[in-house]
Amino acid sequence: MVLIRVLANLLILQLSYAQKSSELIIGGHPCNINEHRSLVVLFNSSGLLCSGTLINKEWVLTAAHCDSNNFQLLFGVHSKKVLNEDEQTRDPKEKFICPNKKKDDEKDKDIMLIRLDSSVSNSEHIAPLSLPSSPPSVGSACRVMGWGKTIPTKDTYPDVPHCANINILDHAVCRAAYSNLLEKSKTLCAGILQGGKDTCQFDSGGPLICNGQVQGIVSWGGHPCGQPHALGVYTNVFNYTDWIQSIIAGNTDATCPP
C-alpha cells in the first residue's frame, strides 16, 4: 500500500494539460478533510486523469471522456503529501459507457460507470454518495470539489482538494454561451453568473453535489475557467438513474435515454 501511495503521489504531481472537464476548482478553498469521502482519484502512468464519485462499495461514477487504459482508482485521499491510514486503491473490473453514445461527440452522454475489482470499505475518509431522487431546481445551492487548477491561466494545483459553492442556473444561460449545448434533460448548467467560481482542468468526472446527492458530473465548460456567463456544464445524473441502477443490478445490456 505504501509503494502504491508513493507511486500515486508521483503520478498526481505530474499533472499535464487536459480539457476543461478535468479541471481544478477556481475560486474555492481547501475542502474539510471529512467532506469529500466519496471523492475518487483516477490515475495512470501519465498522472492524474480525472475524479469520480463512489456511489456504493463496488461502483464509481465518472465522465465517459475520462476513460483510459490501465488506470487505477484511489479512495480516501486528502493530502498528496500526508497519507491517510484508510486510503485504498482498486483496479476497474468493468467499465460501462452508454451503448447509444455518439462515438464522434465527446460531450454526448458523458457518463461512465466503473465496477471495482473488489469492494472498498467505509471508513473515516471513505463513504458513498447517494444518487439523486429528483432533479435539482434552478437556484439550488451545490458543491463542487477536486484537485484541478486553482488559477485559470496557470498550472497551479492544490495539495488537498478544493471546494466551492455554486448554483444551478437556467439552461438558457448556458445555451446563450454555448451553441453546441445538449438538450436540457442531458445536462445541468451551474456556476456563478458573474464568474470567479468554477471547475477547471483535472476536475473532470467529479461530482456536483446538491442536497447531499450527486446531481451532476463535471463535463466541460468555458476557457479560461471561471469567466462571467461562461458556466460549467455537467452531465445530469438524474437523467441516467434508471440506466445506472440497471447496470448495477446486472442488466449490462441496458441502454441510456436517447
Swiss-Prot record:
It is an enzyme of class 3 (hydrolase). Keywords: Disulfide bond, Glycoprotein, Hemostasis impairing toxin, Hydrolase, Protease, Secreted, Serine protease, Signal, Toxin, Zymogen. One of its GO terms (molecular function) is serine-type endopeptidase activity. Its main location: secreted. Glycans are attached at residues 44, 239. Disulfide bonds join 31-163, 50-66, 98-256, 142-210, 174-189, 200-225. Residues 25-249 form the Peptidase S1 domain. The keyword Protein biosynthesis does not apply. InterPro entries: Peptidase_S1_PA (IPR009003), Peptidase_S1_PA_chymotrypsin (IPR043504), Peptidase_S1A (IPR001314), Trypsin_dom (IPR001254), TRYPSIN_HIS (IPR018114). Its EC number is 3.4.21.-. Residues 19-24 form a propeptide. The keyword Hydrolase applies. One of its GO terms (cellular component) is secretory granule. GO terms for biological process: proteolysis. SUPFAM superfamilies: Trypsin-like serine proteases (SSF50494). The active site is at 65 (charge relay system), 110 (charge relay system), 204 (charge relay system). Expressed by the venom gland. Snake venom serine protease that may act in the hemostasis system of the prey. PANTHER family: KALLIKREIN-1, KALLIKREIN-RELATED. Belongs to the peptidase S1 family. Snake venom subfamily. Monomer. This is Snake venom serine protease 3. It comes from Protobothrops jerdonii.
